């Protein structure tokens, strides 16, 4: 009887392992056909080397170049070209912010993706690679300037924005590029033209793209206890030249102007992708990544959609592009929605406060704590344990799971209840989604191991 039970257990174990290791369990519908993104410049080179891809790419560009794009895309030849390109590396290609050939990369990206949508979309997918770094990484790099070992009373009274400017002056690259944009943005052209905004924007883009975040973030997102500090923070980008104008344009008109430029369009799409309020995360940010949101916000500075603090309030953080919703007509609701993504964005507000306080998701605050502004939730996601840092939440961590023979509902021998503990390796999370995969793109191996452990102990007990 015992041998029969052992044989049955062996058979059950074999079938369990086969089912867990089968291809159907490895590839769910959400991962089927997924390809890692390729640099669009490189993807274009690969397409050019293949005759079918290159000819179809030329055809699609001709289809999109016409005045009536929708009519052209209805053409069978255009549709065939698009279908071929969707199977090429060009379809999944992405770009890196500040890369050497960024504009060329973005032009290639939009030459494909502008043909995939009908009409104007409110939110567009970001052409940039997902951000994997966290705020805690920035804190570690900036720790030599953070004054974490200083007296809390002295630290609370200090002007953090002034300290950030001093820290920038200690770095040659930061000092050079900051002095450059200050000089250009303060240079008056004529009594009627206070500066050359185009050159000012270019100098600002160079500063935020070329200076490490541990310097730029401290100047842009420094925490303030008084109005003088908050005004210095507001003046960081020289708003009289780079931000303000005689009149505020309509926000939808400003968005339309921005989307005619590949760089501005891409930075705006990236901001929406990384700062759009999420109802399924603890912080209201996509993937609970403050760093991605702050980087996307800084990436818009120096373009038509440049955002800034609206006032010098040290407590209420409100940012906005220089625009309003006056004259929106029947588009007023859409305009207000667009503007609220800046002025009433809980993700962006929490990210700015978190950086100013020196905190990150599930990291103990080094300064005054704040109450995160929560977006209304449809389904609340529980926070991670206090002893689990954000740097490991997207990596590999160890979770110990304990079970027992009786808990499994199985009948054991008359010996004492035997508890079993086994280790599960948590999965990595694909950026921007709740789906999980293993480091080797395989399924979780914890479950077969767990089943093997449980059944082995059962076999041992039955044999005894």
Curated annotation (Swiss-Prot):
Annotated membrane topology: Lipid-anchor; GPI-anchor
Prosegment residue ranges: 445-464
- State the InterPro entries in the record: GDNF/GAS1, GDNF_alpha, GDNF_rcpt, GDNF_rcpt_a2, Glial_neurotroph_fac_rcpt_a1/2
Which Gene3D superfamilies does the record associate with it? Answer: GDNF binding domain
Q: Which residues form the signal peptide?
A: 1-21
Could you tell me which cysteines form disulfide bridges? 40-93, 95-105, 161-222, 168-174, 185-200, 195-241, 224-229, 251-323, 258-264, 275-293, 285-347
Keywords attached to this entry: Cell membrane, Disulfide bond, Glycoprotein, GPI-anchor, Lipoprotein, Membrane, Receptor, Signal
Q: Where is this region: Disordered?
A: 363-392
According to the UniProt entry, which residue ranges have a biased composition of type Low complexity? 381-392
Q: Which GO terms describe its cellular component?
A: external side of plasma membrane; extrinsic component of membrane; plasma membrane; receptor complex
Positions with an attached lipid (GPI-anchor amidated serine) read 444
Its subcellular locations are:
Cell membrane
Superkingdom to which the source organism belongs? Eukaryota
Q: Which residues are glycosylated?
A: 52, 357, 413
Give the GO molecular function terms: glial cell-derived neurotrophic factor receptor activity; heparan sulfate binding
In Gene Ontology terms, what is a biological process of this protein? glial cell-derived neurotrophic factor receptor signaling pathway
Keyword Cell membrane (UniProt): yes
Which family does the UniProt entry place this protein in?
Belongs to the GDNFR family.
Subunit description: Interacts with NRTN ligand and RET: forms a 2:2:2 ternary complex composed of NRTN ligand, GFRA2 and RET receptor. Also forms a 4:4:4 tetrameric complex composed of 4 copies of NRTN ligand, GFRA2 and RET receptor, which prevents endocytosis of RET. Interacts with SORL1.
Q: What does this protein do?
A: Receptor for neurturin (NRTN), a growth factor that supports the survival of sympathetic neurons. NRTN-binding leads to autophosphorylation and activation of the RET receptor. Also able to mediate GDNF signaling through the RET tyrosine kinase receptor.
Q: What is this protein called?
A: GDNF family receptor alpha-2
Q: What is the species listed in this Swiss-Prot or TrEMBL entry?
A: Homo sapiens
């Amino acid at each position: 009887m015992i041998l029969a039970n052992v044989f049955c257990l062996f058979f059950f174990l074999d079938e369990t392992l086969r089912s867990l290791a089968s291809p159907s369990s490895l590839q769910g519908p959400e991962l089927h056909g997924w390809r890692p993104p390729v640099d669009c410049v490189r993807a274009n080179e690969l397409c050019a080397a293949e005759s079918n891809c290159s000819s179809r790419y030329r055809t699609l560009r001709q289809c999109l170049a016409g005045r009536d794009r929708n009519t052209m895309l209805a053409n069978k030849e255009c549709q065939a070209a698009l279908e071929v390109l969707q199977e090429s590396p060009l379809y999944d290609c992405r770009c890196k912010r500040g890369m050497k050939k960024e504009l060329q990369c973005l032009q290639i990206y939009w030459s494909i993706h502008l043909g995939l949508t009908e009409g104007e979309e409110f939110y567009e997918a970001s052409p940039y690679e997902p951000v994997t770094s966290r705020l805690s990484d920035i804190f570690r790099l900036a720790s030599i300037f953070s004054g974490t070992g200083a007296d809390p009373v002295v630290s609370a009274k200090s002007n953090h924005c002034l300290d950030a400017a001093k820290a920038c002056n200690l770095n040659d690259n930061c000092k050079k590029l900051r002095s450059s944009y200050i000089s250009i943005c303060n240079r008056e052209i004529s009594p009627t033209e206070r500066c050359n905004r185009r050159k000012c924007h270019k100098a600002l883009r160079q500063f935020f793209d070329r200076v490490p975040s541990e310097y730029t973030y401290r100047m842009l997102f420094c925490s303030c206890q008084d109005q003088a500090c908050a005004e210095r923070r507001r003046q960081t980008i020289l708003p009289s030249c780079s931000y303000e104008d005689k009149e505020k344009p309509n926000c939808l008109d400003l968005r339309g102007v921005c989307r005619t430029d590949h760089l501005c369009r891409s930075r705006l799409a990236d901001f929406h992708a990384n700062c759009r309020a999420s109802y399924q995360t603890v912080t209201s940010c996509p993937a609970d990544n403050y760093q991605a949101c702050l980087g996307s916000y800084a990436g818009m500075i120096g373009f038509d959609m440049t955002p800034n603090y609206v006032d010098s309030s040290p407590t209420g953080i409100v940012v906005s592009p220089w625009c309003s919703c006056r004259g929106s007509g029947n588009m007023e609701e859409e305009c207000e929605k667009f503007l609220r993504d800046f002025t009433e964005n809980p993700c962006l507000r929490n990210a700015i406060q978190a950086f100013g306080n020196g905190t990150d998701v599930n990291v103990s605050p080094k300064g005054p704590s704040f109450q995160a502004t929560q977006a209304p939730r449809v389904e609340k996601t529980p926070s991670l344990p206090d002893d689990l840092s954000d740097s490991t939440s997207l990596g590999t961590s160890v979770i110990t799971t304990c079970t027992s023979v009786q808990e499994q509902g199985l009948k054991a021998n008359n010996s004492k209840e035997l508890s079993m503990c086994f280790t599960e390796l948590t999965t990595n999370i694909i950026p921007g989604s709740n789906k999980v995969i293993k480091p080797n793109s395989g399924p979780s191996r914890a479950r077969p191991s767990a089943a093997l452990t449980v059944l082995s102990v059962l076999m041992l007990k039955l044999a005894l």
